[in-house]
Amino acid sequence: MYGYEFYVDPSRCIGCQSCVKACEECDTHRGQSMINFDFIDRSETIGTAAYVCWHCDEPTCAQVCPADAIKKGEDGVVMSALKPRCIACSNCVLACPFGIPKIVPEYEQMMKCDMCYDRTSVGKRPMCATVCPSQALSYVRPEEIAHRREKPTNVFYFGEQKITTQVYMMTPPGTEAVVVDITEFMWEKTNA
């Protein structure tokens, strides 16, 4: 669906996991959910967030694949590893700064969100965005998002590495990029 963009707004996730169930039903996923669903421990409450593949402009997963099994289409969608090329080496899993790809042992293959390519390529919305009741995951025209207080960004910094993506994250007004301090994150994990 050209002219449409994918938006993720973690602040709107209500934890219903409708996206997870809908993703399992997508024809190309063989009953596997490609949604990364996370519980976030906040100081006073537990939050939830659903994440899809961010479809990087320069996908690290594809760059590190020794079998050249991960392809990016002209529309920017980064596809799951192609069988029989995928050797399930996990290089892509380890390299992705977002932690999105997963090796599915029963298929010996890397699988990840492909933005429901079987649907979006024929003008339909991805399954997860179709069922999300709170619009934490949405696939809409940019003008439909423009009225919201939050602003979309598709620029992420992981330390010194700048990553631009096809999927946008809704952020507070004035945020130009999402900066992830990896050293602070690792310090918290090792000293918890």
Where are these regions (language model features)?
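Non-ligating segments of multi-cofactor redox enzymes
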Residues: M1-A192
